């Protein structure tokens, strides 16, 4: 895609939405070129008509048909042509995705606009049908729009005259004319925007702004105030108005750039909202002046009549107060159409041939008809052209044949657009200059040369050299592109050749030269054809002005008759003929040489191709031979592989059978082992059950004995408690008796004192002493007052004395007066307590003897013998309250007490027991405690023998338990080894490492075996510690403290100091029990431990000491 050189910065801003529809390029567009012989002038605003101006370009007709009938296509992503040109740099290759776009066109399209819009145009373009946009306009602007000034004040506005006599206010400033006065070129009379003709305008040209009514892009027209172009025999006339009616945005009423929406039946923005696939779904043109019924009659199949005249009267002046602005502008369009019809009638009188009046099946002045589709329109145009102008095609061919050599390229490009559409033309009249009275037969007329034959290029063929140096091909370019996109040419070193004799290039080079997406899109360097001189015939007369250069343009009708221009050149023509012949001979000679060289080259190429073909045949034969050998080798290899595979399968089958037999043998062996293990386990379970039953019976007997002892202990405790309670009651009774005796003594003293006082009072008063009872005043209350007069005759005194004498005695008075029992003395109390303590001690001795007997018979008892000396020791005298409930200690629940443990340690240390003689508590209790001392001494003497027998029994039981545990655990690992013999072997070993090595040699070195050995060593240490056996070389635990040396050892050691050569005898070590210390090593929470700080609280200050 190449860029457009005439683009301006404002082109993108003034983008017209109508360019979104697919349009075909044409020469009559803006910026197109106008051919005028050798003088080619580029029209800026209005494109000219090629081929002498008599023929309208076929691309223009096609573009007109496409613009009218093509449906608008709405895309999700729309890109303007200007935007695509900005994004794509010059010389770049377009992407493949761009070709698939709906609006893509490979040919260059002209720009829509190069001039910025005015303020009114921008307002109307943004919202052209909005009442809001109209409300923003002023009254003058609305009047201008009603007259067509908003869209008609552009390129076609004349500087002198406007519609309805309006003044040019707020319009575009016209640029200066590009016209240059030359004697051989017609000039326009007005600059851009007015006049009959524009730049390079003449009777033939339709210049910029003049002569073209409603141009293709809407630029200019006489309806905007400019005078019409001069009508002559070559002007388009009525045909141009009919042709303009086909353009979208054009038509007879088109004004300004892009056409007016008032004169057009379609609005591009509104048309895009309808379904493009439904021909009936089209916008409808509403005539504001017509009624609803009239507008419905004008519609046919959903299409509005384009360019049709209104049914309302056009003679009436528009009323601005009655009709809207767009309706008022319609009257101006109608008046413009009437002016065009008048101009067309004048032009028909001057034309040399009748105009085309029915080329699109319409009549001048009648209402326009509507085609159903594009095919309908093309058929109508073709029929009209064939019926009305059959001889014009031959004249058109003659004119095209007389064109210069440079013309066919443009003709071909234009004829490819609509090849089957015949276009009516206006042939030129050569009789105006060939049949001149003065120059008839003497003018030089060059012989028309036939156009250069169009040689169709052969399709491009590609070859490539594969990695085996074999040339592959030929392949078409499309196939190579497909393979490249599919990813077959990934190797950039692959060599590719274009054509038979092209140069080999790698894929990487082609990517760098032509792009990574299309490396095969490039042109081959072809030698340009040699120029051929035209044949010049001998002239019959002198030739004026050498019009050969203008022969192809048919401009003779527009040029005047040359006068008095004669030039006789007879000798000169002969020289030209001679020179021409010489040049022709040289050319023929060169052609012959070239033909000979070409023949030789072809022969050499044929030989080379033959050799290459033979070489390829030989290479193919060698390749086939190699392939056959490879196939034979592969077959032999496959046979060997098959044999090896079969042999391997047989070997695998044998191995599977062997493994199966081994697995079966292993299963049988495992079942036998399991059966043996099950039998052993059964026997072991029976032994364990028997042992458990025995143990259960022993435990039950022990439990019964323990319960019996506990019951007896509870009975003894209850008896002791009752004795204590009775003693307390007796003491309380004695205290109460003492208190009562003291009270009686007090009452007696008070009674005696009262009697003495009464006697004293009677003696002093000389009266009879009143009789007073001996009852206690504290219990009887205060005595009655004796009459102070003391007369016996008083009745009150007599009755009172009688009542006192005969008062009944209180119940407790008899008890007080009863004789009291004598109290026990302190000696009697002590004797009674000693008697009770003796009885209690005898009971405890009997209980202890029974307990020792039960400990000897019980195998589960451990520390029962240690409490034997507890009851043998004599106790000092104490009160009955000292016999607490803890006097009995159960060896099964509480274990040996601290005193029993200390006594046992003392008995082990001394060879013979010593009899403890307790101190006498009191002289009176010495004789009473003697029998108790004797019994305690007897128990202490007999205790060592009993403990020794018990100890031996415990060691044997612990060893048996350890052996049973070892055998049970060892058989879990292996049942083939005699575990009892192994136990006896390792029990004599002191080193734990040796024990571990022996056990692991029979089993394995797994983690479970090591744990088993460690547990065995720990249990052995615990058993030896419990049995009192010292472990001299046991390094797994801390060393034990050495026992204190005995008297015999100390004596021997002192005596051994005399003999220097004698070896010192090692002292026997002894394991000490922690209970001997009488305390535990753990920290107590209720006392201060090491490392703690004792904070002494400060004493409060006594305020009295200040």
UniProtKB/Swiss-Prot annotation:
Q: Where is this region: Disordered?
A: 1-50, 160-370, 383-434, 778-811, 909-928, 1026-1076, 1087-1106
Q: Name one GO cellular component term.
A: cytosol
State if Plastid is listed as a keyword: no
Q: Which residues form a coiled coil?
A: 584-746
Source taxonomy lineage?
Eukaryota, Metazoa, Ecdysozoa, Nematoda, Chromadorea
Q: Which Pfam families match?
A: GYF (PF02213)
Pinpoint the GYF domain residues: 459-508
> Which stretches are tagged as biased composition: Low complexity?
30-42, 334-353, 390-410, 1046-1057
Q: Which PANTHER family match?
A: FI03272P-RELATED, GRB10 INTERACTING GYF PROTEIN
* Gly residues: compositionally biased ranges: 207-224, 248-261
Task: Say if the entry is tagged with keyword Coiled coil.
Answer: yes
Keywords per UniProt: Coiled coil
Species of the source: Caenorhabditis elegans
Q: Where is the composition biased (Polar residues)?
A: 1-17, 162-180, 229-243, 306-322, 786-801
The protein's name: GYF domain-containing protein gyf-1
Determine the domain of life of the protein's source: Eukaryota
Transmembrane regions listed in the UniProt entry: none
Xref: SUPFAM superfamilies = GYF domain
The protein's matches in SMART domains, at most eight in alphabetical order, are given as: GYF
Q: Which InterPro entries match?
A: GRB10-interact_GYF, GYF, GYF-like_dom_sf
């Amino acid at each position: 895609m190449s860029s457009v050189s005439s683009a301006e910065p404002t082109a993108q801003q003034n983008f017209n939405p109508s360019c979104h529809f697919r349009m075909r390029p044409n020469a009559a567009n803006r910026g197109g070129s106008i051919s005028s012989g050798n003088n080619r002038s580029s029209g800026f605003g209005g494109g000219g008509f090629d081929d002498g101006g008599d023929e309208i370009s076929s691309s223009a007709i096609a573009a007109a048909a496409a613009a009218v009938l093509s449906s608008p296509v709405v895309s999700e992503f729309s890109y303007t042509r200007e935007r695509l040109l900005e994004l794509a740099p010059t010389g770049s290759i377009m992407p493949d995705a761009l070709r698939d776009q709906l609006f893509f066109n490979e040919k260059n399209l002209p720009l829509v606009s190069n001039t910025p819009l005015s303020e009114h145009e921008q307002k109307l373009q943004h919202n052209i049908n909005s009442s809001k946009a109209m409300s923003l306009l002023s009254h003058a602007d609305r009047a201008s729009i009603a007259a067509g000034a908003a869209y008609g004040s552009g390129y076609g506005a004349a500087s002198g005259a406007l519609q309805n006599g309006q003044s040019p206010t707020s319009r575009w400033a016209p640029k200066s004319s590009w016209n240059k006065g030359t004697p051989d070129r017609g000039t326009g009379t007005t600059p851009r925007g007015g006049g009959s003709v524009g730049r390079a305008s003449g009777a033939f040209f339709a210049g910029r702004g003049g002569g073209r009514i409603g141009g293709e892009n809407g630029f200019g027209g006489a309806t905007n105030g400019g005078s019409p172009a001069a009508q002559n025999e070559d002007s388009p006339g009525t045909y141009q108005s009919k042709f303009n009616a086909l353009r979208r945005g054009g038509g007879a009423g088109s004004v300004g750039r892009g056409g007016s929406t008032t004169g057009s039946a379609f609005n591009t923005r509104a048309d895009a909202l309808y379904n493009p696939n439904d021909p009936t779904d089209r916008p409808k043109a509403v005539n504001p002046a017509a009624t609803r019924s009239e507008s419905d009659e004008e519609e046919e199949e959903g299409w509005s009549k384009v360019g049709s005249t209104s049914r309302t009267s056009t003679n009436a002046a528009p009323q601005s107060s009655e009709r809207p602005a767009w309706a008022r502008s319609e009257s101006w369009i109608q008046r413009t159409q009437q002016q065009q019809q008048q101009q067309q009638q004048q032009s028909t009188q001057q034309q040399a041939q009748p105009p085309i009046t029915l080329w699109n099946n319409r009549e001048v002045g009648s209402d326009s008809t509507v085609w159903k589709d594009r095919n309908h329109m093309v058929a109508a145009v073709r029929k009209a052209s064939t019926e009305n102008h059959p001889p014009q095609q031959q004249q058109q061919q003659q004119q095209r044949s007389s064109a210069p050599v440079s013309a066919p390229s443009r003709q071909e490009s234009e004829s490819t657009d609509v090849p089957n559409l015949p276009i009516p033309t206006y042939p030129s009249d050569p009789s105006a200059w060939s049949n001149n009275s003065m120059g008839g037969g003497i003018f030089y007329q060059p012989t028309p040369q036939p156009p250069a034959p169009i040689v169709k290029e052969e399709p491009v063929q590609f070859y490539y050299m594969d990695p085996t140096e074999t040339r592959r091909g030929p392949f078409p370019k499309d196939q190579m592109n497909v393979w490249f996109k599919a990813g077959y040419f990934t190797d950039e070193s692959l060599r590719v050749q274009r054509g038979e004799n092209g140069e080999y290039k790698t894929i990487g080079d082609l990517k760098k030269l032509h792009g990574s997406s299309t490396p095969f899109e490039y042109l081959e360097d072809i030698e340009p054809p040699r120029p051929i001189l035209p044949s010049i015939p001998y002239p019959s007369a002198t030739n004026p002005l050498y019009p050969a250069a203008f022969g192809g343009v048919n401009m003779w009708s527009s040029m005047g008759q040359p006068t008095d221009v004669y030039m006789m050149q007879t000798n000169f023509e002969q020289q030209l003929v001679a020179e021409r012949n010489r040049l022709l001979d040289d050319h023929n000679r060169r052609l012959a040489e070239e033909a000979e060289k070409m023949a030789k080259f072809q022969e050499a190429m044929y030989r080379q191709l033959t050799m290459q073909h033979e070489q390829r045949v030989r290479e193919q034969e060698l390749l086939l031979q190699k392939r056959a050998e490879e196939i034979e080798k592969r077959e032999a290899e496959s046979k060997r592989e098959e044999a090896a595979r079969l042999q391997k399968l047989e070997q695998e089958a044998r191995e599977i059978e062997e493994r199966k037999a081994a697995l079966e043998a292993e299963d049988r062996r495992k079942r036998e082992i399991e059966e043996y293990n099950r039998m052993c386990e059964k026997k072991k379970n029976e032994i364990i059950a028997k042992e458990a039953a025995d143990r259960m019976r022993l435990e039950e007997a022990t439990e019964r004995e323990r319960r019996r002892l506990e019951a007896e202990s509870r009975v003894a405790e209850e008896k002791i408690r009752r004795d204590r309670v009775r003693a307390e009651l007796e003491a309380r009774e004695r205290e109460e008796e003492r208190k009562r005796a003291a009270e009686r003594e007090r009452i007696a003293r008070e009674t005696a004192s009262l009697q003495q006082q009464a006697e004293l009072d009677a003696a002093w008063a000389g009266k009879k002493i009143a009789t007073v009872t001996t009852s206690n005043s504290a219990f009887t209350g205060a005595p009655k007052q004796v009459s102070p007069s003391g007369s016996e005759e008083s009745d009150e005194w007599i009755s009172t004395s009688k009542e006192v004498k005969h008062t009944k005695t209180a119940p407790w008075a008899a008890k007080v007066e009863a004789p009291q029992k004598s109290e026990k003395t302190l000696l009697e109390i002590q004797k009674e307590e000693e008697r009770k303590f003796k009885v209690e001690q005898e009971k405890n001795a009997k209980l202890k003897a029974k307990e020792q007997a039960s400990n000897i018979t019980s195998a589960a008892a451990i520390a029962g013998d240690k409490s034997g000396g507890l009851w043998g020791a004599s106790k000092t005298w104490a009160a009955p309250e000292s016999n607490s409930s803890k006097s009995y200690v159960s060896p099964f629940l509480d274990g040996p007490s601290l005193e029993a443990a200390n006594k046992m340690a003392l008995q082990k240390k001394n060879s013979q027991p010593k009899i403890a003689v307790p101190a006498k508590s009191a002289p009176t209790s010495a004789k009473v405690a003697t029998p108790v001392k004797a019994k305690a001494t007897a128990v202490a003497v007999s205790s060592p023998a009993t403990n020794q027998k018990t100890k031996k029994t415990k060691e044997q039981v612990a060893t048996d338990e350890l052996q049973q545990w070892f055998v049970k655990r060892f058989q879990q690992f292996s049942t083939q080894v005699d575990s009892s013999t192994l136990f006896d072997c390792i029990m004599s070993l002191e080193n734990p490492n040796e024990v571990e090595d022996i056990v692991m040699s029979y089993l394995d070195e797994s983690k479970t075996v090591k744990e088993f050995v460690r547990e065995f060593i720990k249990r052995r240490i615990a058993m030896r510690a419990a049995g009192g056996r010292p472990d001299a070389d046991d390094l797994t635990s801390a060393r034990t403290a050495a026992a204190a040396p005995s008297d015999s050892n100390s004596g021997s050691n002192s005596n051994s100091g005399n003999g220097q050569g004698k070896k010192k005898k090692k002292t026997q070590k002894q394991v000490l029990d922690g209970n001997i210390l009488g305390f535990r090593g753990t920290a107590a929470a209720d006392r201060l431990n090491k490392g703690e700080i004792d904070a002494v609280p400060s004493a409060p200050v006594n305020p009295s000491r200040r």
